[in-house]
Amino acid sequence: MGCRKLFVSCVLLSCARYSFAVEFNSEFLNIDSDDHVSLGQFTQAHYTVPGSYVVDIVVNQRYFGTRSIEFNNGGSAQDSYACLPEALVATFGLKPELFESLPRVADGQCVDLTAITNASINYAQNLGRLVISLPQASFEYDDPNYIPPAAWSDGLDGALLDYRVIANQRQSTTSGNSTVLQSYGTAGLNIDAWRLRADYQAQQDSGSQGGRGNEQAFQLNRLYAYRALPSIRSKLSVGEDYLNSDVFDTFALRGVSLSSDDRMLPPNLRGYAPLISGLARTNARVTVAQQGRVLYSTTVTPGAFSIQDLNSSVQGTLDVTVHEEDGTEQTFTVTTAAVPFLSREGELRYKVSAGQPRLTGKGGTEPGFVASELAYGLSQDWTLYGGVLAASDYLSHAVGLGKDLGVFGAISADVTTSRATLRNSAETVVGNSYRINYSKHFDAIGTDLRFLGYRFSDRTFTNFSQFVGDPDAYSLNAGKQRYSVMLAKRFAWLSTSLSFDHSTYWDAAPSDRFGLSLARSFAVGNVKNINVNLSAFQTRNAQNRDTQLYLGVSVPLGGNSMMSATVQRASPGATSTSVGYSHDDGEGMNYQVYGGMGDNKYVNAYVGKRASTYRANASATTDGSTYRSLTGEFDSSLVVTRYGVTAHGNGSNGDTRLLVSTDGVPDVAFTGQARSNRDGYTVMDGLPAFQAYEARVNIEKLPLKTEVSNPIQRLALTEGAIGYVNFAAAQGYNAYVELTQANGQVVPFGASVQDKHTHKEVGIVGEAGITYLLGAKAGAELVARWDDSHLCALAVLPPEDVVTNIPTPVRCL
């Protein structure tokens, strides 16, 4: 028995020690001669015939897009390897020192990842997937959503225009008639990493409402240039800007700013976006502005609304105006979240600005100033931070501590001291302001605590806006206390949200705003997704006390149609009720009609269209006797690059976007509303900056005879970039052919038929030259390759409309 075990062991060891190439006996194949067989690519396990292959890139089970990878000859005739370009490897997020130390091969064109201990690269040919496995210690951060700076793209040089046009005509027996035409937007120019932006507003009023005649106004609210500095994870801005500060109150400036950009940091150290909620009585337009500059505008339907997609860099106090269709307006302010200024251990973050304040009012002053702030990460997740703001006759300095509490969020506390010589009295006053901030999203209990902050200021504390401002233009009431809370909680049967803003002043009445929303979804019999919403908002200040209550019920009717009923109560004011019907066709078109009664009976009709190149809507309201209102809105954007002019739907404030090419194939749909135009281009807008973004083809909506070999592309863009990706789309047909060479012999079994220019494989030659071509495009140049050195070009392919089960002879010359 022992000898037998020893014999078996020796055999197994010898098998493990030696590995021979697989040899095929072509006699088992039904072919005429070995000369017509090319089986070299099948003789070695894991061997890939050199050439270009479109593959899915997977690194540690994370998808990194689909792209063409070149396989090169290795050290022997039976060896090949995947050439991984630096630009691709840079997106993996390796530690910078490791990435720089990796060997470059093939004249520096390829990065050798196998130099990393325990790394492996395997090409699963049957799946078209290049699987890369790397030790976790190789990565700079263990975060699947973090993309390293080396992988960020500045995009294309080009120009852009985001614009919105709103027209309203109102006829009223009580307030007169008016016609208002408004437009606002952003024009921009991208040159390398620089972004030049100009925000504009234009308005023309005519009519008798309010005693107005014809009025026209045009202004550039902001003209500035900026660029990302990835090497120091900072943003440089020149021109008209706003002080971006975690320590001091924000104000408009004209000058230069250099600051760390937390969007370049790992996601867990990035800020929260502001949340704005309220109530609309009609199809209203909600405008969010800061010191006269429109930051955001949208149309909302009657009832409760919530705006959560403002840029996370927006800070300070925002002015929100709800423009109702009957001409009335409601306004309120929202204090945006101030996330604690945290830094990792040993990291220094900074913000420096110099220039002059602007928008200070007619009687204001514009002294030169310098502002700077620093934050340094200490051990045990502590951060020490502070800042200085200095101008002639003014000095303010702050110091504070922040702490990362891990699963419990983050907290900070600071004190700011100001010393100012007042212009009107030449008196020098000194005061302090104390602040505590806290923020956290509690995933475990399904609660989002957007912001909780408290600030107390002495009577003699003076912020910079108060120091330079005009008392006739801006309120210089000295703030005493201020705090804000935004809380959302989802239960199994109920969703709730709560917001509260409170401000008190030393020489003025306090102001408060309270909001509460409750939402419930349930089923009655076979009718599912019945929604009930209850909202209450109250605003209190020295001038008025406004309370609004809203109750809404919506019942789905099937086929994307819905009935709804609402009851609203405004105090002071009357109670109004409405009943409506709405429908969405699922392709971007929606409309609604509803009627109701309040002070008067009224009826409203609305229609909206969301296309890949524009957004448009129109609405009409009348009570049949005292007023009529007609409103239209059109939003669109233009991108101009070396690829031409491309229109797309509603970019915003010159934000980041992606120009997509589909190789001239029209009507290719992508996730969302984007769809390639007749020239094969489209634009995806609203992309996050410095983060991974996946552009995806909607395979289910591909046109007939169209295929895309790389339906998913992954990239990361810098702020304001016009990115570019190409999807290898093709419109073609299938063909059944018999391939023969110029000497009359058939093309060898196993040869690969590829597109001459893209190297995309469209078929593999079978027995007797019989080949089934998939996705062949009329007029395409196809070649057959075998044995690494043999190549012939296919002559004329059979016509597209010929369908037969008999192979069509095609010469390969």
Describe each PLM feature range.
Residues I57, I276-G278, L658-T662, Y733-A742:
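A short, amphipathic beta-strand motif
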Residues W152, L181-D192, N214-P230, E366-Q380, ...:
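Feature captures outer-membrane beta-barrel proteins of Gram-negative bacteria and organelles
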Residues S138, A167-Q171, A193, A202-S206, ...:
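Transmembrane beta-strands of outer-membrane beta-barrel pores
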Residues G75-L84, L310-Q315, Y681-E707, E719, ...:
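Short Pro-Gly-centered beta-turn/loop motif in secreted/extracellular proteins
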Residues L161-Y163, A198-Y200, L236-V238, Y350-A354, ...:
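Membrane-embedded beta-strand positions of outer-membrane beta-barrel proteins
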Residues I69-E70, Q673-T682, T758-I770:
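Short, acidic Ser/Thr/Gly-rich low-complexity loop/linker segments typical of extracellular
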Residues V49-F71, A284, G664-A674, N743-T758:
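Short, ordered, surface-exposed loop/turn motifs in non-cytosolic proteins
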Residues S9-L12, S19-R270, S571-V639, G649:
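Post-signal-peptide, soluble extracytosolic/periplasmic N-terminal scaffold domains
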